[in-house]
Amino acid sequence: MPKIHPTAVLSGDIELADDVEIGPHCVLSGKVRVGAGCGLVGAVHLQGPLVLGAGNILYPGCAIGFAPQDKGFAFHKEGAGTVVGDGNIFREHVTVHRATRDDRPTRIGDRNYFMACSHAAHDVQIGNDCVFANNTLFAGHAEVGDRVVTGGGAGVHQFVRIGRGAMLGGLCGASKDVCPFFTLSATNYIGGFNRIGMKRGGFAPADIDLVREMYGIVVRSRVPFSQRVARLETLAGHPLADEFIAFVKGSKRGISTRHGRATSTRAAASAEGE
């Protein structure tokens, strides 16, 4: 039997697993399904259509599934809603908005950690095992791969893709795609690749060396970008290289390299760390 605080308000088609705990002043509206082991600490607002998987913990002030911040979106339109996987943590005042589309929901994967005041806008697609520091912002339709880490105040432009294993530094902005395992150290400025993260993730030394080589081709080379892509294609056949090539060739907003906004101090620090 779910534990529901007497001050909580549930209205609509609400489906709760038997061990769900709902704290004081929570509000659940519309078609909402909450999976086993979920806990709503207090003052959490859930708006359907919303599917919340198992083992998610939501802290006070979280608002999940409300209408997009899109002036052309009718407030009462449901659309495809929001789908959240398992084992996620949403700290205080995290917001996730439902999709504008009818065929694909806003989607959050498994085991992600959203620190306080993070925001995932409408139609965002987020993978698994990510960590987003306070005030990280993902604009509409952004796509985020697995094991991405952001510093506080990082911002991602609409439709931008962040490849798996990438890192975005605090207060950094991305209006171009960030390749898998790259590190963003200033706005659209790649400062290196995530060697430590790859080691911690169990990648073999040969895999790390391959990513280092691809980083050199994409970021440090000064030949036209089409020639860089051609050089990448000579590495095809390795799973990491194939993933990387597909990511680069699939870009619609361009790839972050070393032509972004970086102070001389940060640029020098990045160069020393290579």
Model-derived segments and spans:
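Structural signal for interior beta-strand "rungs" in well-ordered beta-sheet cores
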Residues: K3-S185, Y189
